[in-house]
Amino acid sequence: MKYLLISLALWLGMVGIHGTELELSETQRRGLQVALEEFHKHPPVQWAFQEIGVDNANDMVFSAGTFVRLEFKLQQTSCFKKDWKNPECKIKANGRKRKCLACIKLDPRGKVLGRMVHCPILKQGLQQELQESQCNRITQAGEDPRSHFFPGQFAFSRALKHK
C-alpha cells in the first residue's frame, strides 16, 4: 500500500508539472525571452531563475504590433544572475519560487514597444489590480491615440461641419 501511495504521489507530481505545459507560439516565446531578460536585469535579483511552467499565454494583434500576456512560474537556480542563460544551471530543490505576470508589446519586426514584468515571491501573492492597470497601459503602447473611435464621434463632427 505504501508503494502504491508513493507511486501515485510521484505520478501526480509529474502530471502537475508537465501536464499543464502550454505550447507557446513564436511571438509568445519571444515575449517570454524578453520577460526573463527584464527580470534578470532587476538589481535586487542576485540568483538566476529558470522558468518552470507557463500557466497562461495570450497574444492580441494591434495596428502597432502584438501584445503578449504571460503568466508563468520561476524557480531559483544555483547560478548567479549573470549566468542565467547557462543551461548547466540546476534548479535548487528549496530555491525561491516566483509567480510572474509579464505584458510585452512587440512591433511586427520583434522590437519591444513596451514591457511590464512583475514577479513577486510566490508566498506574497499577486497585487492583481495594480498589475492589471500596468498591463493595460502596455496594451496601448505604440498605438495611435486617435485611432480609437467612440460612438457618435463622426455624427457630431458632420453635424458641426454643415452649419
From Swiss-Prot:
InterPro entries to which the protein is assigned, alphabetical: Chemerin (IPR029562), Cystatin_sf (IPR046350)
UniProt keywords, alphabetically: Chemotaxis, Differentiation, Disulfide bond, Inflammatory response, Secreted, Signal
Disulfide bonds: 79-89, 100-119, 103-135
Residues making up the signal peptide according to the UniProt record: 1-20
Post-translational modification as stated in the protein's UniProt record: Secreted in an inactive precursor form, prochemerin, which is proteolytically processed by a variety of extracellular proteases to generate forms with differing levels of bioactivity. For example, the removal of six amino acids results in chemerin-157, which exhibits the highest activity, while removal of seven amino acids results in chemerin-156 which has slightly less activity. Some proteases are able to cleave at more than one site and chemerin forms may be sequentially processed by different enzymes to modulate activity levels.
SUPFAM superfamilies membership: Cystatin/monellin (SSF54403)
Domain of life, source organism: Eukaryota
GO cellular component terms attached to this protein's record: extracellular matrix; extracellular region; extracellular space
Location of this chain's protein in the cell: Secreted
Propeptide: 158-163
GO biological process terms held by the UniProt record: cell differentiation; chemotaxis; inflammatory response; innate immune response; positive regulation of chemotaxis; positive regulation of fat cell differentiation; positive regulation of protein phosphorylation; regulation of insulin receptor signaling pathway
GO molecular function, one term: signaling receptor binding
Main subcellular localisation: secreted
Primary role: Adipocyte-secreted protein (adipokine) that regulates adipogenesis, metabolism and inflammation through activation of the chemokine-like receptor 1 (CMKLR1). Also acts as a ligand for CMKLR2. Can also bind to C-C chemokine receptor-like 2 (CCRL2), but with a lower affinity than it does to CMKLR1 or CMKLR2. Positively regulates adipocyte differentiation, modulates the expression of adipocyte genes involved in lipid and glucose metabolism and might play a role in angiogenesis, a process essential for the expansion of white adipose tissue.
Name of this protein: Retinoic acid receptor responder protein 2
Organism: Cricetulus griseus
